[in-house]
Structures are given as structure tokens and as C-alpha cells.
Amino acid sequence: MPKPSKKINLRKIKKKVPKGVIHIQASFNNTIVTITDVRGQVISWSSAGACGFKGAKKSTPFAAQTAAEKALRPLIDQGMRQAEVMISGPGRGRDTALRIIRKSGITLNFVRDVTPIPHNGCRPPSKRRV
């Protein structure tokens, strides 16, 4: 006789997070916005690809704006009031995503650019000849 299966609770537990860190990773091909608490546990995330943009449209500023809006939506329910912003990468969507975060009403403690800069490391890709 089969055992009765236990009901598994798959719903996420929503906790109040007053302060957090917003990471914007803007590459040449995509923009990823990740929102964590102070310890580094992910609260919400979004990317241009996850918002439905494909191919070259993922690297546009509008795609970054949509990704930032989608990532910030759950924060209103969880009561985040203060945040720190870490921007990484040379992509086109970094300024647009930051603009949306500023308009959202969350107080920004600081905005830091954490783009890794090599001290003459690997050879960069060659220039395109079209």
C-alpha cells in the first residue's frame, strides 16, 4: 500500500528587509539586476533576457530599464527603504537601470562602480573589421 504523500510548501517566506544591496551587472550583451540583503542572500533578480528580450535587443537601455523595474517590484512588499548600489561592467544599460532605481523611492546610501579593471592582464579581443 502506498504511503500518503506529505504536502510540500513551495511558497517563499516573505520577510521584512529594511536595507539591501542592489547589484547591476551590465555586459555588452545583457543587463542583470540582483537585489540582496546585507548578508548577500538574494531577494529578487531579473535580467533583460528573463524579461523577454532576445538577441541584440537584450543590450539596449530599454531592456535594462524593464529588468530593473521587474527586480524592484517585490521590494515594495518587503519594505526596503535603504539600499547600496554596486554597478559592474561596461554595458549600455547601467545608467538607465540606476535612473530607475533612483526614481523608485528607495534611499541610496552610496553608488559604487566595482567594474574589474586589469593591470595589463589578458590580451583584449581584436577590433572588428567589417
Curated annotation (Swiss-Prot):
Give this protein's Gene Ontology molecular function annotations. rRNA binding; structural constituent of ribosome
Which SUPFAM superfamilies does the record cross-reference, listed alphabetically? Translational machinery components
Tell me the Pfam families matching this sequence: Ribosomal_S11
Respond yes or no to whether keyword Cell inner membrane is given for this record: no
Q: Which GO terms describe its cellular component?
A: chloroplast; ribonucleoprotein complex; ribosome
Q: Name one GO biological process term.
A: translation
The answer, when asked if Repressor is one of the entry's keywords, is no
HAMAP family per the record?
A: Ribosomal_uS11
Name recorded for this polypeptide: Small ribosomal subunit protein uS11c
Native source species: Chaetosphaeridium globosum (Charophycean green alga)
